[in-house]
Amino acid sequence: MPSNGDLDRQIEQLMECKPLSEADVRTLCDQARAILVEEYNVQPVKCPVTVCGDIHGQFYDLIELFRIGGNAPDTNYLFMGDYVDRGYYSVETVSLLVALKVRYRDRLTILRGNHESRQITQVYGFYDECLRKYGNANVWKYFTDLFDYLPLTALIESQVFCLHGGLSPSLDTLDNIRSLDRIQEVPHEGPMCDLLWSDPDDRCGWGISPRGAGYTFGQDIAAQFNHNNGLSLISRAHQLVMEGFNWCQDKNVVTVFSAPNYCYRCGNMAAILEIGENMEQNFLQFDPAPRQVEPDTTRKTPDYFL
């Protein structure tokens, strides 16, 4: 197994946006799997920690996030999924986050988003990018196999519940979530799917999601869930919000989105949420990093409900 020195060299290489070799990715994913298999569906996290939303392959904006929030391991991070697809640098982005996880396992928590799936990545860019950068699909397979092991949710100091998407009509308690078998491809429906796909909504109760997966849930649902589970807040990602963060549902829910100028065209700010040693909350907003020369690519990304 590679030493910390090897990992440090790989992280240094990735910070320059240079992909690892296929063999290094395979070894890295093996190491990461051994760590993630020991983690929980509701992974406990201590404060202080900085909570981040979608990244979507926007590598230089991830570097900007670290510049604004502090580098690992000096800052503890919790990422709420969607590392790949849409941006130009999914390979480098997910490689860096996984390498940081392996190097600093207790300082970094990486959750699963709806894009950490075999099916979605074949449509929205990660699969094609792996083919283009490596000449075969092996790296795509190593990462998508690893994605099955990512925790679904995290719980900061038993108070702030973090996940990619939202709530599920099948899950009333955190113990319900703890009892799920997560080590599988994201299903098309059911509680695991809902956690990664659902969205808060202005209407009360449960609704049909326009995304075709998951549900919409109202303020009444979020307030009841928080009350039942002794929570102060649900922190989630999954939706573009123009200021980078957005409170909703009487401050029972906050959306954090960390990909500025999403898809290189949406004009939004990004944000991260710092949770301090006394659970105080501070949002840091940031604009896109200066544009790098984009790689030669004529990929057409299908438009899709944001």
Curated annotation (Swiss-Prot):
Mn(2+) 2 binds at residues 82, 114, 164, 238. The active site is at residue 115. GO terms for cellular component: cytoplasm; cytosol; nucleus; peroxisome; plasma membrane. It is found in: Cytoplasm, Cytosol; Nucleus; Peroxisome. CDD domains: MPP_PP2A_PP4_PP6. It catalyses: O-phospho-L-seryl-[protein] + H2O = L-seryl-[protein] + phosphate; O-phospho-L-threonyl-[protein] + H2O = L-threonyl-[protein] + phosphate. Its cofactor is Mn(2+). GO terms for biological process: abscisic acid-activated signaling pathway; chloroplast avoidance movement; negative regulation of abscisic acid-activated signaling pathway; positive regulation of fatty acid beta-oxidation; protein dephosphorylation. Reversibly methyl esterified on Leu-306 by leucine carboxyl methyltransferase 1 (LCMT1) and pectin methylesterase 1 (PME1). Carboxyl methylation influences the affinity of the catalytic subunit for the different regulatory subunits, thereby modulating the PP2A holoenzyme's substrate specificity, enzyme activity and cellular localization. Phosphorylation of either threonine (by autophosphorylation-activated protein kinase) or tyrosine results in inactivation of the phosphatase. Auto-dephosphorylation has been suggested as a mechanism for reactivation. The keyword Translocase does not apply. The keyword Manganese applies. Keywords: Abscisic acid signaling pathway, Cytoplasm, Hydrolase, Manganese, Metal-binding, Methylation, Nucleus, Peroxisome, Phosphoprotein, Protein phosphatase. Dephosphorylates and activates the actin-depolymerizing factor ADF1, which, in turn, regulates actin cytoskeleton remodeling and is involved in the blue light photoreceptor PHOT2-mediated chloroplast avoidance movements. Associates with the serine/threonine-protein phosphatase PP2A regulatory subunits A and B' to positively regulates beta-oxidation of fatty acids and protoauxins in peroxisomes by dephosphorylating peroxisomal beta-oxidation-related proteins. Acts as a negative regulator of abscisic acid (ABA) signaling. May regulate ABA-dependent gene expression. This is Serine/threonine-protein phosphatase PP2A-2 catalytic subunit. The gene is PP2A2.
